[in-house]
Amino acid sequence: MKMKMKLASFGLAAGLAAQVFLPYNALASTEHVTWNQQFQTPQFISGDLLKVNGTSPEELVYQYVEKNENKFKFHENAKDTLQLKEKKNDNLGFTFMRFQQTYKGIPVFGAVVTSHVKDGTLTALSGTLIPNLDTKGSLKSGKKLSEKQARDIAEKDLVANVTKEVPEYEQGKDTEFVVYVNGDEASLAYVVNLNFLTPEPGNWLYIIDAVDGKILNKFNQLDAAKPGDVKSITGTSTVGVGRGVLGDQKNINTTYSTYYYLQDNTRGNGIFTYDAKYRTTLPGSLWADADNQFFASYDAPAVDAHYYAGVTYDYYKNVHNRLSYDGNNAAIRSSVHYSQGYNNAFWNGSQMVYGDGDGQTFIPLSGGIDVVAHELTHAVTDYTAGLIYQNESGAINEAISDIFGTLVEFYANKNPDWEIGEDVYTPGISGDSLRSMSDPAKYGDPDHYSKRYTGTQDNGGVHINSGIINKAAYLISQGGTHYGVSVVGIGRDKLGKIFYRALTQYLTPTSNFSQLRAAAVQSATDLYGSTSQEVASVKQAFDAVGVK
């Protein structure tokens, strides 16, 4: 969730982040192209791209890339370089594929491409292929540092500049060897993940040059997801009753085994809610009660965390046919009463964590259904587009969580509105919220691309610039006139379907606002047809916020 105080961070690779829509050397009259400004290569292509009878969907992609090698500035063997990571058929008749670009078997950081094939025709290619890696002398020398040396460099910097003490790591120190590209420079590098809860929660990603040990990039990606181990109680499924943070009564699924536990066995591999008991050790104790009635004030945050996790699960299952955040029914864990007076909620990489607030800035954060759904949507994003939590890709990441947090609030019909966190933020100030999707400028966030934040605070403006996309989403749903551009609203349901398809099938880790526009337009085209009002409204909304 966004705090009013922003965090400092470095900028993401400019070459991956810089994209723009230009009428630049169109590949064919039937193709629509969004170009990467830095590389002057295609970033998003749609149309009837290639049809070869008797060819597999992935082979169409390889042939298309090689056929257009000069446009992509990509002169390597596509089949050897593009590693197929995912392939599935969707309910619209498309074969969807996700590829990871590699260089001599080494993954290129953030370089993911998705493609769509229908009726034997390649119809879309989304994502930036990093060009001319075969000409980079810096990649030919080989690595000189070990994984341990890279981790030591990252930890030393973390302690010196972030934590001021050696933290207790929650999930070890994961390290991956990659090719990292920043503008025209390419480096062999280690990606080091440092995940911890004390002295303050963090999930830092360091990019360390594997030759000279230089820190190439670093940022806090607290909402990145990895499944955690869950120990369940063997018992009888029951239904309890309790009262939430705002005093509303609700039924909750529990499990009986001597005590009644906040363990919901009816959804996927379970929903589990824990009591952190004001400590910072997770997950804490699985919440237990003697009589299956949760009406004590201490129970309220647990009641809401448990109930709203279930509502979020139901939304994704019933509306988008998605089973939990990973699409494979992963268990959902939540811990409440984290630390003392803690003014935040976050996904720590494997579970939800909720502070109780200090009573002035926040009340217990699990009391906001949009807060719960926002954070769980970060996990959905990590398992699909994998949007890097920095600069424009990070702002899209935040906006996606705001959009679906709001849509879950409407789905539950829980006093729904287009504000974020209004139920738990500043209880002494009526009508206040963290962000507004209908009017981002109300809280100082930009509502037009010309007003975007371009500094390094807030991971390059991930919460700030999300306002631009939030406003576009609001206009797509509700309609209106913004900066002189009129938008015809198409409703929340269609907004959700368009953005869910864009998130899960077209966006890639380094997507920027231009690619999001192209992805949303293509998703609307897939769902409703190229001449539909839905496509027109998506274009109008992005025009209204200055995203081309």
Curated annotation (Swiss-Prot):
One of its GO terms (cellular component) is extracellular region. It is found in: Secreted. Ca(2+) 3 binds at residues 409, 415, 417, 422. Ca(2+) 1 binds at residues 289, 291, 293. Its cofactor is Ca(2+); Zn(2+). Keywords: Calcium, Hydrolase, Metal-binding, Metalloprotease, Protease, Secreted, Signal, Zinc, Zymogen. The keyword Cell membrane does not apply. Zn(2+) binds at residues 374, 378, 398. Ca(2+) 4 binds at residues 425-426, 429, 432. Its EC number is 3.4.24.27. Pfam families: FTP, PepSY, Peptidase_M4, Peptidase_M4_C. It catalyses: Preferential cleavage: Xaa-|-Leu > Xaa-|-Phe. Belongs to the peptidase M4 family. Extracellular zinc metalloprotease. This is Thermolysin.
